[in-house]
Amino acid sequence: MSKPVKAAVFGTGSWGTAFGTVLADAGCEVTLWGRRAALADAVNSTRTNPDYLPGVELPENLRATTDAAEAARDADFTVLAVPSQTLRAGLADWTPLLAPGTVLVSLMKGVELGSAMRMSEVIGDVAKVGAERIAVVTGPNLAREIAARMPAAAVVACPDETVAQRLQAACHTPYFRPYTNTDVVGCELGGAVKNVIGLAVGIADGMGLGDNAKGSLITRGLAETTRLGVALGADPLTFSGLAGLGDLVATCSSPLSRNHTFGTNLGKGMTLEETNAVTKQTAEGVKSCESVLDLARRHGVDMPITETVVAIVHEGKSPVVAVKELMSRSAKPERR
């Protein structure tokens, strides 16, 4: 009888806990790592994560610890589920503890500020491992629905198809259906940019601009995501799949989406400070909109919706003025 797959999940937020639950339900032995002893104790004693997934029962083969070395020991997969802008510092601490040969799995959907690196690039840069040992999980995966064992599909991406298949097997359950892909660039960009477009759609919803505006933003948002991806060498077909359109639709249409909710509050007239105060978890698009725009400018890619989000979120531009400016841009063919 083969030994069970071991997985370490660094991050006890909603998505880290939800994906840890998927891995455990698929038969893995899962250890969650988090900084707060009280939360780790609650996971182990009550079988719930009261801070991020209250009311969701966690599997018996999932446990939590504050000891990073204990979590990382002998892990076949080391899953990274922390805010994207904190990854570099955290991984620098964890790298000496990693099990030999472990596959590093990114759940994060962002682009690093300053370097404009995708998360897999940050992982490779810090941990000094090859791309064949770095995988990405992405798609329309709202954490609370996954944790409630509601049906969902996802993409597991790695340049090495065999590694992608191993991860696929490790997280395949009756309610979670993963597909493999070798286009890591496209899969990561789809996840990072959809957070920005989710903010834009949320702002439009908060302003009461209607469903035509929402449909237009989603579609043109997908177009600028694809332009950026192609400029970076991604397969354009990736953006019509789960990592692109699938994730974008879920983020832009669900009240469970942090980015959509954040944008809605801004569109209703709340300040950035007020919106931050009522948001308990990270809305990745708030910081990633700047790094996505930086990445686009480095490659000469026009991303007007992303530019508009940056202007509203970080430059204090009125949403009303920003929408007027976006709508008054020079006319052009759709396929450009």
Swiss-Prot record:
Single biological process term from Gene Ontology: glycerol-3-phosphate metabolic process
Annotated protein name in UniProt: Glycerol-3-phosphate dehydrogenase [NAD(P)+]
Predominant subcellular localization, coarse grouping: cytoplasm
Top-level taxon of the source organism: Bacteria
Protein's gene: gpsA
Cystine pairs: none
Location in or out of the cell: Cytoplasm
Pathway: Membrane lipid metabolism; glycerophospholipid metabolism
Secretion signal, residue range per the UniProt entry: none
Binding site for NADPH: S14, W15, R35, R36, K109, A143, R258, E284
